């Protein structure tokens, strides 16, 4: 057994001390004590057991120490594991929060990106709107420039039109002055044919002029006395009541206008029409031809019927019904404040006198129709209007002969007056009624016959335009047809020559009545035969009025 034991290799390699012990001791002992007895063998085995026990105890202690170390390490590792787990949880929370914030920031970024896209689209639309506004501004600038140019052109046009209006105003003033200078355009009116108010105004005017000239008693006016148109113009220029269609002065406490609007109603019926009876307040014609109201005829002014107040008219009034004062006649209406013209201008009074002289011929149309004249050259028909022609035969004979020359003269005179703007010739400028030099001679001749002062009344005044005379006229006058139509001479010398023989007739027969006929020897041979068309060119534009006037027996300018 011993020889075979060392020869065997152990199963595993033992530690060095064990190998040394096992190899050295038993081998040496076996080699040295091979012949040992059993007792020695037992002793050696016991020692080996004790040594093994000692080694086992040390190994156990080491194992326990290692176990304790392992437990301590395990506790430390568990602590570290818990800490690492806590840290992991913290990290997980942080990661979760970071992830949430990231998603939130991502959503915010998406929203911001959408807003940026919308802002970009809005900016594009804004840019387009800005470009459009700039284009509109440029267009408006161009329009402003064009409108400014148009305004400048309009201003220049307005200035030119104002200059033309000024020229036309001056031309109208010149035309009115020419019409006023040419006294043969208007006929004289009988004192009895004038309206009552106009008779009172003429009587006051003549009485005031006579009192200023001589303090003696003023002569009375005869019904057949002839009132020149210039006297009517002078009377109507005075600031008195100009309401010929009202018995009361509706403008007594108000300032009067310089010019009034004359409306001639040409749409009424025949004066003798039974459909238009006299109104209660109409005046009754007196035997001497003068007009008196009903209150004055009865002798009680308190019993006068109230008349309607004066109604102001627009510049183009509608025709009114027949007035109670003048039933069946042409109503002349006035407006005091529609036409305002400066006080210095000669246009208002002249225009008013011209229209009044024309319209007065329409007022007495009723009396002309009431007495038809068998003789074609009666004064009523001869004095109906400046263009009255008693029979159509002289018109057909004289008008074609002088129509060409009169039209040419008209064109030449109007071109010279209004186009070339040349002053009127001396012969036309001197066509006034009576000058200052003619008044003393007429006073001297008419002062010899005191019996005729009821018929012949002079109108003295400080101005030459007011120094005209009221002359009588009778039916059987020896006028030529042209003089009978126009009834006024051209120059003051011819007027004086036509008026002076009347004084001689009154001196020869002072006791004769004013109803006797007197011949007025006018120098008709020295005057050229003129055509009635020299009145003006208005007949070319008022054909309806001309036709109606020809049918009624009156020619209206």
UniProtKB/Swiss-Prot annotation:
Bias kind Low complexity: ranges: 394-405
The biological process GO terms on file are: Golgi organization
Q: Which residues carry this modification: Phosphoserine?
A: 300, 320, 345, 491, 545
What spans are recorded as compositionally biased (Polar residues)?
Answer: 378-388, 546-557
Reported tissue expression: Ubiquitously expressed.
Which compartment or compartments is the protein found in? Golgi apparatus, trans-Golgi network; Cell junction, Tight junction; Cell membrane
**Cystine pairs:** none
In this chain, composition skew of type Basic and acidic residues spans 14-23, 439-456
What's the superkingdom here?
Eukaryota
Region of interest (Disordered), ranges: 1-37, 266-303, 309-328, 364-409, 439-557
The answer to whether keyword Ribonucleoprotein applies is: no
Nucleotidyltransferase as UniProt keyword:
no
Positions bearing N-acetylthreonine: 2
Chief localization class? Golgi
* Compositional bias segments (type: Basic residues): 530-542
Q: Which UniProt keywords apply?
A: Acetylation, Cell junction, Cell membrane, Coiled coil, Golgi apparatus, Membrane, Phosphoprotein, Tight junction
Could you state one GO cellular component term attached to this entry? endosome
Give start-end positions of Pro residues composition bias: 274-286, 316-325
Q: Which residues form a coiled coil?
A: 42-171
Post-translational modification Phosphothreonine, affected residues: 318, 422
**Topology of this chain in the membrane:** Peripheral membrane protein
Q: How does it assemble?
A: Interacts with DLG1. Interacts with ARF6 (GTP-bound form).
Physiological role: Plays a role in regulating the structure of the Golgi apparatus.
Could you tell me what this protein is called?
Tight junction-associated protein 1
């Amino acid at each position: 057994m011993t020889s075979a034991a060392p020869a065997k290799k152990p199963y595993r390699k033992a530690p060095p001390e064990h190998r040394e012990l096992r190899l050295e001791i038993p081998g040496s002992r076996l080699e040295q004590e091979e012949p040992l007895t059993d007792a020695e063998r037992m002793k050696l085995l016991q020692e080996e057991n004790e040594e093994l026990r000692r080694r086992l105890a040390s190994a156990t202690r080491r194992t326990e120490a290692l176990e304790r170390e392992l437990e301590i390490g395990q506790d430390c590792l568990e602590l570290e594991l818990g800490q690492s787990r806590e840290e992991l949880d913290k990290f997980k929370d942080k990661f979760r929060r970071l992830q949430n914030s990231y998603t939130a920031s991502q959503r915010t970024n998406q929203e911001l990106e959408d807003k940026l896209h919308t802002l970009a689209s809005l900016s594009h639309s804004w840019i387009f709107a800005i470009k459009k506004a700039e284009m509109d501004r440029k267009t408006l600038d161009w329009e402003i420039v064009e409108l400014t140019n148009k305004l400048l052109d309009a201003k220049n046009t307005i200035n030119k039109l104002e200059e033309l209006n000024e020229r036309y105003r001056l031309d109208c003033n010149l035309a009115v002055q020419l019409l006023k200078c040419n006294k043969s355009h208007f006929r004289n009116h009988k004192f009895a044919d004038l309206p009552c108010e106009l008779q009172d105004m003429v009587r006051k005017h003549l009485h005031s002029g006579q009192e200023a000239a001589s303090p003696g008693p003023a002569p009375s006016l005869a019904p057949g006395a002839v009132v020149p148109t210039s006297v009517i113009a002078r009377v109507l220029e005075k600031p008195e009541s100009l309401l010929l269609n009202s018995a009361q002065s509706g403008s007594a406490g108000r300032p009067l206008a310089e010019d009034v609007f004359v409306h001639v109603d040409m749409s009424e019926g025949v004066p003798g029409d039974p459909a238009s009876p006299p109104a209660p307040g109409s005046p009754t014609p007196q035997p001497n031809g003068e007009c008196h109201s009903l209150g004055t005829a009865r002798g009680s002014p308190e019993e006068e019927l109230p008349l309607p107040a004066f109604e102001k008219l627009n510049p183009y009034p509608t025709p009114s019904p027949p007035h109670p004062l003048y039933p069946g006649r042409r109503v002349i209406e006035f407006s005091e404040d529609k036409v305002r013209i400066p006080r210095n201008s000669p246009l208002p009074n002249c225009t008013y006198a011209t229209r009044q002289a024309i319209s007065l011929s329409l007022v007495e149309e009723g009396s002309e129709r009431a007495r038809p004249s068998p003789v074609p050259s009666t004064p009523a028909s001869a004095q109906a209007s400046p263009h009255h022609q008693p029979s159509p035969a002289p018109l057909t004979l004289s008008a074609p002969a002088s129509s060409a020359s009169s039209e040419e003269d008209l064109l030449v005179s109007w071109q010279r007056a209004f186009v070339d703007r040349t002053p009127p010739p001396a012969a036309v400028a001197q066509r006034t009624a009576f000058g200052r030099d003619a008044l003393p001679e007429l006073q001297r001749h008419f002062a010899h016959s005191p019996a005729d002062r009821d018929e012949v009344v002079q109108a003295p005044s400080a101005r030459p335009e007011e120094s005209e005379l009221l002359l009588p006229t009778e039916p059987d006058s020896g006028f030529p047809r042209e003089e009978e139509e126009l009834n006024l001479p051209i120059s003051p010398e011819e007027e004086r020559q036509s008026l002076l023989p009347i004084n001689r007739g009154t001196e020869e027969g002072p006791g004769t009545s004013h109803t006797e006929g007197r011949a007025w020897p006018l120098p008709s041979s020295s005057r050229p035969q003129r055509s009635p068309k020299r009145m003006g060119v208005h007949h070319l534009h008022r054909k309806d009025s001309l036709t109606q006037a020809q049918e009624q027996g009156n020619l209206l300018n």
